[in-house]
Amino acid sequence: MTTTIPIHLRSDALNASILPRGATLSAVRFTQRSENLVLGFADPEDHFRIPVYAGHLVGPVANRIKAGEIPLDGKIYQMTRNENGETCLHSGPDGLHTLDWDIVARTDQSATLQIDLKDGDQGLPGNRNIKATYSIAGACLTLEIAARTDQPTPMNIAAHPYWMLDGLSDVSSHLLEVRADSYVPTDSRNLPLGDIAPVAHTEFDFRTLRPVPLTPALDVNFCLAPESHTKPQSCARLAGSNGTQLEIATTAPGLQVYNGAFLPDLKGVLENGHDLKPYGGIALEPQFWPDAPHQPGFPQITLNPRDTWRQITHYRLTPPA
């Protein structure tokens, strides 16, 4: 299908591939090297058959929503409880990651994809138009997402690539730095407790570069700012054992970090016949803080008519020496 035929972007330093279904980032490579720096499947259809959100844009409401309920303007909007029958994760089984986006502009260095959601889609209000533009300049891949609506509606879209910079068996070979002083504590369902906590003297202190842990499972939202920035701000650095480095700058007020603890063990499904395994990639997801509609002290995610929701993220890569 054409929606799983990749769009290829090129610069003098990087190549990237995007699948129109899910606006999925399926490959990032240095021009002079063959290794894929994100999890990419040998069969592009496996990006959608294997439910790990690899490379997808997730939303319109990323992360977890308690009971799948969105309180808005005196009403409760019900989303699908697709996680243990209790929470809605990434807008349920029919979210943006499953949809066939239209290609509305394309050059060798950039591609813009678009999707329209009708009023009531995913149980949410408003006719919504969402555009995602991937572009490459030198060794920097940029993703800009913009959304508009004709009714107040929640909006929190996140990119979900899994990074693996050195091709080794798990992410414990990587070093991670997250420039955040606080994080969102959660309960056993990974729903916020309602406060934020300092990272100091906790397992979540990544303010200096240190190894990505395998235990306990890491799936936490770091608080980058109390609201969105107008321009991308540096927030994280990831370094592979071979010297490859990734720097992330974003306008988003949060960064969800997931160390891939619950990725399935599947033989030969990745490019070049490699296996997919637990901890086989790390997701670094700029976004708003989770379950914001139920947390009045968090940055809020309501998009109003005549406003534009916008998020810009730069992924700057440095090759091995």
What do these predicted regions represent?
Residues 1-321:
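An exposed, glycine/acidic-rich loop-and-rim segment of catalytic or binding clefts
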